[in-house]
Amino acid sequence: EIDIDQVCIGSCTNSSFTDMMKVAYILKGRKVAENVSLAIAPGSKQVLTMLAENGALADMIDAGARILESACGPCIGMGQSPNSKGISLRTFNRNFEGRSGTADAGIYLVSPEVAAVSAIAGKLTNPVKVLGDMPEFKIPEHFLINDNMIEMPASVEESADVEIKYGPNIKNVPVGKPLEDSISTQVTLKVGDNI
């Protein structure tokens, strides 16, 4: 039995509309365990809006979840870093020491269903033992498309008149010397594939 401190669901992996609907189904009418912090990052603005429109977002919030921006976040250790020696369940696609932002945290990669059930139980939990079979969640015929916050690039003609304003802390990238055609040096470190 593994007690947990934190659960993070979503980001760019395991954050589709269907994944989020499964999470909302599990959380509906339940509460996140007192000792657990649950953070959910829907995979896109469209997914977030669809969850808001059908009531699933309210189910997540009512259960005690913190809703994060649809962006990189806990996956890269930017926010929601677990406490020192804490146990965090995450639905992300990467895991290595320190990735969460806390070098000595215990990070377990799990499915959205395991994450949601465990957030309620306060410990790593098999959803099949708690819920039995999950219902099928049908993919909507039409997905919401709302790009109202995306600023399209200027045309070639318009771009000549675009002024880019830099603050005093923004500097141009230093330009180095071009690489030589041939480089001969000693290799000091070779790393494996799990970086």
Question: Language model features by range: what are they?
Answer:
Residues 1-195:
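Fe-S-dependent hydro-lyases/dehydratases of central metabolism
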